[in-house]
Amino acid sequence: MADPHIKSPMDFLDYLTVIIYRTGFVIAALAVLTVSWYPDLSLTFILIAATCCASSLHIYLKSFRLLFQFATWIGLLFYINHYPALALGGALLTLGGLCFKEYFCFRVPLLNLQPIFVACLWFSWVLNNLIALRIFSIISGVLLLVLAIQKWRMPLHFDIGDKTKYQI
């Protein structure tokens, strides 16, 4: 997690990856909100969102960074091999985990429970429970949207923090 009080020098790739990361949350919010109405299209965009976030992740601890990146990669592999439920699970693991991380920056109410909400969303998808899917897609989508708005309101360097703390 970045230290907002530290402003490390940023190059073009730093700016680009922060923009990609934040855009991922916008895409995720819209895709999750529509998942019960347009499941195939939403799944594609949820995977795109998770890829944006995981590919451009600025987190100090290498183990968590790799966990979120590999969950997304595995989700993408399941997607191209026609296992949509498992693909969705990998993407939601990444997005839910990142929301939990971001909770400690913003203290958005209920954001720390996002991993539980996306797990319920996933189970609703797998069990084909449309009512539960709509409920959890609205809860998760709104939380992602609030997070996306909060992220875009702050300076880009807040996502980077102290570059000397990153585990390589």
Curated annotation (Swiss-Prot):
Source organism, top-level taxon: Bacteria
Membrane-topology annotation of the record: Multi-pass membrane protein
GO cellular component, one term: plasma membrane
Disulphide bonds in the chain: none
Pfam families linked to this entry: DUF2301
Transmembrane feature ranges: 15-33, 41-57, 73-93, 108-128, 129-149
Keywords: Cell membrane, Membrane, Transmembrane, Transmembrane helix
Compartment(s) of residence: Cell membrane
Record carries keyword Membrane: yes
Record-linked InterPro entries: DUF2301
Official protein name in the record: Uncharacterized protein HI_0120
Organism: Haemophilus influenzae (strain ATCC 51907 / DSM 11121 / KW20 / Rd)
